[in-house]
Each structure stands twice: as structure tokens, then as C-alpha cells.
Amino acid sequence: MMIPWQDLAPETLDSLIESFVLREGTDYGEHERSLEQKVADVKRQLQNGEILLVWSELHETVNIMPRNQFRG
């Protein structure tokens, strides 16, 4: 189920994004990016509709995924 990120309290959204960024461990190439930069990147992608917040009823977790991978 898709979660409208705009409906979340800003602190909740930040916590979800930080948790996602910290567990992803994505390689950003030669230059490491700060947590704040990574969070800002994810927020921008949410605002642009490139990615979605998704609730998994099976796992009872929230995840962030590319829009084109969501099958709801």
C-alpha cells in the first residue's frame, strides 16, 4: 500500500528517510555524501514522484522504492 509522504509529520518522514539511507549503504562514487545530503536527495525524489513510500502488510514495514517497481 502506498503511503502519501505529504501526510506524515516532518519528523516522522525524516526518521523514515534516515533509516532507509542508513540501511541502504549505497555507494556514491568517489565523493562520500553526508547523511543530510542523502536525506535531501531522497526527499527531492519523493517530491518529484520518482520514488514512493510503501507499507508492506506482509512484513509490517515501510520501504522506499522506485515508482516503476511498485505493484499496488
From Swiss-Prot:
Q: What positions belong to coiled-coil segments? A: none
Q: Extract the InterPro entries matched here.
A: UPF0270, YehU-like_sf
Superkingdom of this protein's organism: Bacteria
Note one Pfam family from the annotation.
UPF0270
Q: Which family does it belong to?
A: Belongs to the UPF0270 family.
Q: List the protein's name.
A: UPF0270 protein Ent638_3781
